[in-house]
Regions:
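Glycine-rich Rossmann-fold phosphate-binding loop(s) that bind the pyrophosphate
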Residues: 132
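Active-site core segments that coordinate phosphate-bearing ligands/cofactors
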Residues: 1-126, 135-159, 165-192
């Protein structure tokens, strides 16, 4: 879609296998939580941070599209400032900060899906999350909650698996994309959130 409306919403078309194109919007994704983890110096895993964030009650969110989060001197401070400037609760620790990030991303996903549906005239009943974000159980639950859609999360190594899948189709191991997708779904522990 090369319309003015698509450009206004910062949408893109990404080329893929077999001359297919995906209409999409690049979202900050896990960059914010990676920055928070690194800056905090914690030795906890992303899964542990995600779990601990899910047990906090802060409801603050920030705009993940805001350029202030692209490369701030301190991601933790920038998130706190954004919360303060908007009159919301300021996160008090790593876990509240992570909760703000996860809730903000889920809200961002919901608004992006609404934009895509508006531009395409299509309604999507499910969301597929792949890559590292698919391991963030709390984020996936929030995404299902905020979007009202079923979320399928995984596989986490989607790029490598996708490259292998294309080679297997080309060599005749699979008849088509549908067959390889079914195999991936059955083989890699895709989790479902509703």
């Amino acid at each position: 879609d090369c319309s003015d409306a698509a450009m206004k919403h910062n949408m893109a078309s990404e080329g893929g296998y077999n001359r297919r194109y995906r209409f999409l919007k690049n979202i900050m994704g896990m960059w914010m939580i990676q920055s928070v983890k690194k800056e905090s110096g914690t030795t906890l895993s992303y899964a542990q941070i995600c779990d601990k964030a899910s047990h906090t009650s802060i409801d603050s969110t920030v705009d993940c599209y805001d350029e202030r989060f692209l490369a701030p001197e301190s991601m933790i401070d920038e998130i706190a400032k954004a919360c303060e400037e908007s009159g919301q609760q300021i996160p008090a620790d790593l876990y509240e900060t992570a909760n703000v990030v996860y809730k903000s991303l889920a809200k961002c996903y919901a608004s992006t899906i609404a934009e895509i549906e508006e531009l395409t005239g299509e309604h999507y009943t499910c969301i597929n999350i792949v890559g590292g974000g698919s391991n963030a159980e709390y984020l996936n639950r929030l995404t299902a909650q905020y979007t009202g859609r079923t979320v399928y999360a995984g596989p986490s190594e989607a790029t490598a698996i996708g490259n292998l899948a294309v080679q297997m189709i080309s060599s005749g191991e699979f008849a088509n994309e549908a067959a390889v997708r079914r195999c991936i779904f059955d083989s890699y522990g895709v989790n479902k959130y509703e």
